[in-house]
Design a protein with these regions (language model features):
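Short, glycine/acidic-rich beta->alpha junctions
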Residues: 45-49, 129
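Active-site clefts of carbohydrate-active enzymes
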Residues: 21-44, 77
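The substrate-binding groove and active-site-proximal loops of carbohydrate-active enzymes
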Residues: 1-6, 33-46, 83-91
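Carbohydrate-interacting/catalytic domains
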Residues: 4-25, 55, 60, 64-65, ...
Length: 185
């Protein structure tokens, strides 16, 4: 997502949904790991960061924040670093923005965690082509639903969603799988 290889990422998601959507529950969603630059170094502290962070916490699977990510720390952390070497000050603006935009989503993680009602959509442009840079998906739990739409490219996007991409459903009698699609409405 950082490198905006959106079509590749969406293809992986589609392949998982067509093979077995339950796999999505086992994924760990993260923005960085100890072998990489920190999340704020890779994504900044504004639109890109909060867009990807929103996806991280609203996709099925386990969202995992890196060490110091919410505070905006830039010092790498990992097993080869036994102690902190920098005296970093927490970025209170970044923390407050997490509290406003991300934490409420985490408090409702039950709405996003399951895969039984998770649907990924193609985002169509006015000329009928799929815009692979826009991630559109929905999920539902009991009588609550959520629709997430995020353009992971620094450009204008205009279009619509209607039908989900194909996902497999297991037949309980013979364990065979069938591909189906649903409409947003």
């Amino acid at each position: 997502l950082r490198d905006e290889e959106n079509a590749k990422y969406r293809t992986v998601m589609k392949n998982i949904l067509e093979f077995d959507p339950e796999i999505l529950k086992r994924l760990v969603n993260f923005m960085n790991n100890p072998d990489e630059k920190t999340a704020v170094e890779q994504f900044g502290k504004d639109k890109k960061y909060f867009g990807i962070c929103t996806m991280m916490v609203t996709m099925p699977g386990l969202p995992m924040f890196g060490h110091g990510q919410i505070e905006g720390f830039t010092e790498k952390y990992g097993m080869e670093y036994r102690k902190a070497y920098w005296e970093e000050t927490p970025d209170y603006h970044l923390i407050k923005r997490h509290e406003r935009e991300i934490f409420p989503l985490l408090h409702n993680k039950y709405l996003f965690a399951g895969v039984d009602n998770f649907l990924l959509y193609d985002f169509f442009t006015d000329n009928g082509k799929v815009n692979e840079d826009v991630f559109a998906y929905s999920n539902r739990y009991d009588n609550r639903s959520a629709l997430v739409v995020y353009n992971n490219k620094n450009n204008h996007a205009k279009g619509w969603v209607k039908n989900s991409v194909a996902y497999s459903v297991k037949n309980e009698q013979d364990a065979k799988r069938t591909l189906i699609k649903k409409t947003l409405i």
